[in-house]
């Protein structure tokens, strides 16, 4: 009977009403935390209300685990601060969507090399002749000489000619009138014609760029022709566009790359050379006579490297056609289409395969 008398208060301890608060003895922090977990829901709620009413309560007061509903209210401010910090410094996540680069790989097979960070390459050095003319009669005589040289190339049907233009630019007034035309038909000689003193282009120069045997090429060359036609109406942009070659587009066709190219990136990718594209020279006063040495070298290098790139792409195209033909003869049309579908460019010879 004594045993039951001793254990009865312990049995009723959990069934106490809020008014029957037991005398709390000093306990260790660990025991106190354990005891707080054994409180009834009503006691826990009253304890939370008491904690919320205490103005000087710190972070320690929120260390105990409250009821689920009350927890959302108590931690609202903390979550708000956390969300604000995350919005200012969002964590890096892996997106399930296709990025631009992965999309190009999925849809086009090979990402554009122009977007790949180029390695350190040697700068282009041009050691050929630069023939510079500023007057109408001198430009006409020079263009006529080039045209006669083209006519003498009887062993070829097409004579490639690198073509580029320069003009001044102002952030206040925009682009100025076409000031310089530079051409290159031989890697050993470049021609620079300054148009500042010309009201019309010489007939010999117009005849040269429209010569049926001449194939003008460059990067974004169609825009240059439209600009030239606006400044000199005697030039027909449509006629020039029909027979010109955009080196960037041609590179994509042969090398099966994608994207838009600049001359500098094409030089990196095809010729393995770097170009010194000085902004000071590029944005200089191209209409002022005479051009200085830096301007002349800048203009000459643009068409010189264009001619080098054209010759390189020309050789790649020929080799590609040979490799494709040999592969078809050895493996058949079905194998060729299968390998082509896997992304093979045939820029280099591949051995016989078994499917």
Curated annotation (Swiss-Prot):
It is found in: Nucleus. It is an enzyme of class 3 (hydrolase). It comes from the Eukaryota. Coiled coil: none annotated. Mg(2+) 2 binds at residue 164. Has exonuclease activity on both single-stranded and duplex templates bearing overhangs, but not blunt ended duplex DNA, and cleaves in a 3'-5' direction. Essential for the formation of DNA replication focal centers. Has an important role in maintaining genome stability. Residues 13-29, 71-91 have a biased composition (Basic and acidic residues). Gene3D superfamilies: Ribonuclease H-like superfamily/Ribonuclease H (3.30.420.10). Belongs to the WRNexo family. InterPro entries: 3'-5'_exonuclease_dom (IPR002562), 3-5_Exonuclease_domain (IPR051132), RNaseH-like_sf (IPR012337), RNaseH_sf (IPR036397). Transmembrane segments: none annotated. GO terms for cellular component: nucleus. Keywords: Exonuclease, Hydrolase, Magnesium, Metal-binding, Nuclease, Nucleus, Phosphoprotein. Residues 1-119 are annotated as: Disordered. GO terms for biological process: negative regulation of mitotic recombination; nucleobase-containing compound metabolic process. The lineage of its organism: Eukaryota, Metazoa, Ecdysozoa, Arthropoda, Hexapoda. Its EC number is 3.1.11.-. The modification Phosphoserine is found at residues 104, 112. It holds the Pfam family DNA_pol_A_exo1. This is 3'-5' exonuclease.
């Amino acid at each position: 009977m004594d045993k039951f008398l001793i254990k009865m208060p312990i049995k009723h301890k959990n069934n106490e009403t809020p008014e029957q608060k037991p005398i709390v003895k000093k306990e260790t922090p660990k025991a106190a935390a354990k005891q707080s977990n054994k409180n009834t829901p009503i006691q826990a709620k009253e304890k939370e209300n008491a904690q919320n009413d205490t103005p000087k309560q710190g972070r320690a007061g929120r260390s105990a685990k409250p009821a689920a509903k009350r927890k959302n209210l108590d931690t609202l401010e903390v979550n708000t601060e956390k969300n604000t910090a995350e919005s200012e410094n969002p964590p890096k996540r892996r997106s399930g969507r296709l990025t631009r680069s992965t999309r190009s790989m999925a849809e086009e097979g090979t990402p554009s090399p122009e977007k790949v960070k180029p390695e350190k390459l040697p700068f282009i050095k041009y050691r050929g002749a630069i023939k510079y003319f500023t007057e109408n009669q001198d430009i006409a005589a020079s263009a006529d000489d080039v045209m006669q040289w083209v006519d003498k190339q009887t062993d070829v049907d097409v004579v490639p000619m690198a073509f580029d233009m320069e003009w001044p630019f102002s952030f206040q007034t925009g682009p100025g009138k076409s000031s310089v035309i530079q051409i290159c038909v031989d890697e050993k000689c470049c021609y620079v014609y300054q148009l500042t003193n010309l009201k019309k282009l010489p007939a010999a120069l117009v005849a040269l760029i429209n010569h049926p045997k001449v194939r003008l090429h460059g990067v974004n060359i169609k825009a240059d022709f439209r600009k030239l036609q606006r400044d000199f109406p005697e030039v027909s942009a449509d006629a020039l566009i029909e027979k010109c070659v955009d080196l960037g587009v041609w590179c994509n066709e042969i090398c099966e790359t994608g994207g838009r190219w600049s001359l500098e990136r094409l030089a990196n990718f095809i010729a393995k050379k770097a170009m010194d594209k000085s902004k000071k020279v590029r944005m200089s006063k191209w209409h002022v006579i005479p051009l200085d040495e830096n301007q002349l070298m800048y203009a000459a290098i643009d068409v010189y490297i264009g001619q080098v790139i054209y010759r390189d792409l020309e050789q790649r195209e020929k080799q590609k056609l040979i490799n494709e033909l040999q592969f078809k003869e050895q493996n058949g049309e079905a194998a060729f289409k299968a390998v082509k579908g896997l992304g093979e460019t045939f820029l280099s010879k591949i051995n016989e395969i078994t499917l």
